[in-house]
C-alpha cells in the first residue's frame, strides 16, 4: 500500500499543464485492503514535499524561471521504487531493480 495527500493544480491558460504536490507519502506491506485505513511508514521527512510538473509540451517559460529562481531543477523520483527500496532495507535484503516491466522482489 502506498498513500499520500495530494494537492493538484491545472493550468488555466494551458490545460495540458498540471502540477501536483504530494505530502505525507507513506507505505506499508500489510493490511493491504483499502478498508484498513491509510496509515503507514513515512517515506520522506515531514518537511519534504514531492512536486511533479506534467505537461505535454515544453514547460512554460514563466514556470521554468520561477523554479530556477528557487533552485528547483528536474529530477527523477519514483514513490513506488523508493518504497520498494525501503521495504528491502528493512528486510535487510538487496533491492533488485531494473528498468524493465518485469516484476522483481527482495531476495
Explain the meaning of each model-derived region.
Residues 1-107:
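Phosphate-end processing signature that detects enzymes handling 5′-triphosphorylated RNA
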Amino acid at each position: 500500500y502506498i498513500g499520500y495527500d495530494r494537492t493538484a493544480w491545472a493550468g488555466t491558460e494551458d490545460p495540458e499543464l498540471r502540477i501536483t504536490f504530494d505530502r505525507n507519502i507513506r507505505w506499508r506491506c500489510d493490511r493491504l485492503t483499502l478498508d484498513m485505513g491509510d496509515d503507514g511508514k513515512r517515506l520522506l521527512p515531514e518537511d519534504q514535499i514531492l512536486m511533479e510538473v506534467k505537461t505535454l509540451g515544453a514547460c512554460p517559460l514563466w514556470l521554468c524561471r520561477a523554479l530556477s529562481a528557487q533552485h528547483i531543477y528536474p529530477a527523477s523520483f519514483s514513490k513506488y521504487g523508493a518504497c520498494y527500496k525501503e521495504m528491502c532495507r528493512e528486510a535487510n535484503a538487496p533491492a533488485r531493480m531494473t528498468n524493465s516491466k518485469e516484476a522483481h522482489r527482495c531476495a
